[in-house]
Amino acid sequence: MKSYKLNNPNLLISTHTHNKLFLSSSPFNLLFSFPSFIYLKQQRSLFFFFFFFLCFSFTTSMLDSDTDTDSGPVVATTKLVTFLQRVQHTALRSYPKKQTPDPKSYIDLSLKRPYSLSTIESAFDDLTSESHDQPVPVETLEKFVKEYFDGAGEDLLHHEPVDFVSDPSGFLSNVENEEVREWAREVHGLWRNLSCRVSDSVRESADRHTLLPLPEPVIIPGSRFREVYYWDSYWVIKGLMTSQMFTTAKGLVTNLMSLVETYGYALNGARAYYTNRSQPPLLSSMVYEIYNVTKDEELVRKAIPLLLKEYEFWNSGKHKVVIRDANGYDHVLSRYYAMWNKPRPESSVFDEESASGFSTMLEKQRFHRDIATAAESGCDFSTRWMRDPPNFTTMATTSVVPVDLNVFLLKMELDIAFMMKVSGDQNGSDRFVKASKAREKAFQTVFWNEKAGQWLDYWLSSSGEESETWKAENQNTNVFASNFAPIWINSINSDENLVKKVVTALKNSGLIAPAGILTSLTNSGQQWDSPNGWAPQQEMIVTGLGRSSVKEAKEMAEDIARRWIKSNYLVYKKSGTIHEKLKVTELGEYGGGGEYMPQTGFGWSNGVILAFLEEYGWPSHLSIEA
C-alpha cells in the first residue's frame, strides 16, 4: 500500500483515504470528516492547521481585493503635466476657500525661460519642504509662480483672421429688424476676439507647454477655455459659414485632422492633458458643412483617410459594444470610454475629493475613469451618467450606451459614404451606406421607446466587453434633451409618422422652456441638467424638426429658435457678453452650476445664434425685447 507523508510526520494514510479527503467538495467536510483511526490529538492538530490555512487564505484574498486595479487602457501624460498637478494641489491648499483659484489656470502654465523643468521642480521641493507640511503662504506661492512660469494663455497669441469682413456681402439679409441686425454684426465681430494662433515656442519646445502645437489658427471657446475644443468646433464652423469665413473654418478642420493623424483620434482639446480622451465625433460633419458651401474636393480627399482612422477608434476596443435583440440579431454600437483612471489633471483636487469616500483603489480608479468618460461625452456633468441620481459618486458613464454618440456615428457613416462618392469610390460609399443602415436599425430596436415617443439611453448589464441581450428595463426612462437627438438625421426626420410621434413627445416632455430646451428635468446642481440649456442641443433638435415636412415640427423648430435667440440677446444686453449656456427656465438669464464659474465668449453659442438667424431671420415688426 503506497503512503504519503503529511505535515504531521506520525500520520500515514492510504492512497484511497488521501483521495477521499482531498477530493471532498467542501473544506468543512475536510475539517470534520477525519478517518476514525486518527487519534484525537492528531485530529485537533489537523483542525487547527486547516483553520489557520483558511484564515490566511481569506485575509490574503481581502488584501488582494484592496490592491486590485482597473485594467482598462491608460494613456500616459507628460512630466510637465504631472508636476503642474503638484503646483495646483499646493495652490488650492494655500488659498482661502472663498478665494480658491481655477485649478485649470495652474495646469495651463508654461515654463519660463531659461529655467528647465528639473530646476523648477527642485525649487518647488525647497519651497514646500520649508512649509513643514503646512500650506505655503499665498504671497510666497504667487512669487514662485511669477518667477518660474509664464501665465496661463500666454502661449496662445491673438490672430487677426484673414477672411474677416465687418459686414460681409449679403450677411443675414433676412434679418429685417435693425436692432437684431446690429446685434448680429456684434456677434459676428466676436470671431476676432476668439481667433488665436499657437506661439512659435510651443512648436519649438513642446515639452515646456501643455498647449499642443497646431498648424493653423484656432477659434477658442473663450474665458478659461484657452485652447481649441473638438465638438465645440462644429457649431463654431456653422457660425463661420454664416460669417463667410471659409479659410478660418478650413483651418479648424486642418488642426483637428492633424490631431487624428498624430493620435488616431481627435482630442477633447489641444492640451497634453487631454490626450487620454476624445469628444463627440463631429469631424466628418465639419468637413461636410464646409464642402456643402465651398465644394472643396481637395479637403474631402484629405479628410477621408483620417475619418476612417477616427471611425475605427470609435468602433473598436472599449468603445465598441454589442447588444443582441430578441430575434438574436447583434447590433454593434458605441459608448464613451476614456483612457484614464486617475483624477483629471485640470480638476485633480475636485476629483480626489469626490472619490474620497471609496475604500479601495479599484473603486477609485473606476470612478475616475467614469468621470473622465463623462468629460469625453462633452456633457460633464449630468444625472444622465449616474446610477443613483443626483448622487455624484454613482457616476457610471462607461456603463451607458448613449443615444447621441450613436447619432454622431450614424452621421459619420453617412458623411463618409457621401465623401467617398464625391471622390469616386463607389464601393467604399456602398459599404458605409450599409453600415449606416445597420446602425439606424439599432435605433429602432435598442433605443426607441414607443410609449415615450423618444430614443432612450441603454444601460449595460455587464462590462460591455461581451455581447449582451437587450432588456427593456435597461432603458433609461428619465427625460433628457439627448432623447430627441436622432431627429437631427435626415433619414429619420423624413419619416412623417415618426416625426409626429416625436413632436407630441417633445411637447409633453416638460423640456420646452421659456428660453429654449432644457437639458434634463432634474435640477441636480450639475451644469448639464435643469435649469440649463446648451447651444448644441438647441441646434440639433431645431435643425432636425425644421428639415421635416411636418408643419407642426417646422413651427416648433422656429419657435424654439426664436426663444433661444431672444434670450441670448437679452443676456448680451444685460452683461455685454455671450455665455456658454443659458438658464432656459427664464428669459434673459445665463446658466450656472457645475465645477467652474459661468464662462463667456462664447464660440458655439455665437455659431448657433448666427446659424439660427440665417435660417429664420427676424421680421421688422417682431420685437426682440422682453
From Swiss-Prot:
GO terms for biological process: trehalose catabolic process. One of its GO terms (cellular component) is plasma membrane. InterPro entries: 6-hairpin_glycosidase_sf (IPR008928), 6hp_glycosidase-like_sf (IPR012341), Glyco_hydro_37 (IPR001661), Glyco_hydro_37_CS (IPR018232). The chain crosses the membrane at residues 20-40, 45-65. Disruption phenotype: No visible phenotype under normal growth conditions, but plants accumulate high levels of trehalose and starch. Elevated trehalose contents and drought-susceptible phenotype. It comes from the Eukaryota. Its EC number is 3.2.1.28. Alpha,alpha-trehalose binds at residues 224, 232, 268, 277, 279, 344, 346, 580, 595. It catalyses: alpha,alpha-trehalose + H2O = alpha-D-glucose + beta-D-glucose. It holds the Pfam family Trehalase. One of its GO terms (molecular function) is alpha,alpha-trehalase activity. The keyword Repressor does not apply. Plants overexpressing TRE1 exhibit increased tolerance to drought stress. Belongs to the glycosyl hydrolase 37 family. Forms homodimers. This is Trehalase.
